[in-house]
A protein has these predicted regions:
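Charge-dense, low-complexity intrinsically disordered regions
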Residues: 165-185
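A surface-exposed partner-binding patch
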Residues: 1-108, 117, 177-182
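Low-complexity, glycine/alanine/valine/leucine- and proline-rich hydrophobic stretches
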Residues: 113-117, 128
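Short, Lys/Arg-enriched alpha-helical microdomains
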Residues: 213-230
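Compact, glycine/acidic-enriched structural inserts
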Residues: 129-155
């Protein structure tokens, strides 16, 4: 059984779920490099959605701005550049070797490590909260990483311990236009100053909320933070 078949067992796509069709040639032309075959199969199998109620993959031409691969490549790369300019802690990898591929509810990022830009099937995975400086490396492709995460077989320092108690699952995002528009309004507001989990935690404590140093930020706390800053 290959990794994709195992992932479909652990996190089955909903019955009748049909992801959007992708023009891979145009996507790769826009990014300037080829993409891994396993990622293409993931996108064609799942489309936009949530793995283990925590992690989402960026998608080509995604109607959700926060998940659009090209848009997030630009935005996250800009964050990497700013981080290099102001941080006392250097990045463990040059930005040119990091291709954003996903994010989490807590503001963590998933990257491909492009050790050879022309051989994408050999790319491995790096995960970071960026602001806290913690980086984790997974020596396998994206699908294998999702399998390991779903089986609790990999340790990612940026991820909350509560994820180990989370059942494997995949939940597709709604295609309702009004929900997409609402999400994009919030995404566009946040683009200029991307929210980091430590900023939310600090604000929450200053305003009387009880939040752990690590772990999933409660939904009511995140909503209160967003309401106070938008």
């Amino acid at each position: 059984m290959n990794d994709l078949e195992r992932l479909k067992e652990l996190c089955p796509p909903p019955p009748g779920h049909t992801p959007p069709t992708v023009n891979w040639h145009d996507t790769e032309q826009a990014l300037g490099h080829p993409l891994p075959d396993d990622y293409k199969h993931l996108v064609e199998t799942y489309g936009p959605g949530h793995f283990v109620q925590f992690l989402s993959l960026y998608q080509p031409k995604c109607p959700y701005h926060a998940l659009d691969l090209e848009r997030q490549t630009r935005d996250v790369n800009a964050q990497l550049t700013r981080h290099q300019e102001v941080s006392q802690q250097p990045l463990p990898h040059p930005p040119r070797e990091l291709q954003p591929v996903g994010g989490t509810d807590n503001g963590d990022y998933l990257f491909w490590l492009k050790n050879d830009p022309e051989q994408p099937n050999g790319w491995t995975i790096a995960v970071t909260g960026l602001k806290d400086g913690d980086w984790s490396h997974f020596d396998g492709n994206l699908t294998a990483f999702l399998v390991a995460l779903s089986q609790h077989d990999t340790d990612v320092s940026a991820f909350p311990d509560s994820l180990l108690r989370q059942s494997p699952s995949f939940t597709p995002y709604t295609t309702a236009p009004e929900e997409i528009e609402k999400a994009n309004r919030h995404s566009n507001t946040a683009t200029a100053a991307p929210v980091q989990s430590q900023d939310v935690r600090q604000w929450a404590r200053e305003n009387g909320y009880d939040v752990p140093e690590r772990g999933r930020i409660p939904a009511d706390v995140r909503k209160a933070y967003d309401a106070a800053h938008n």
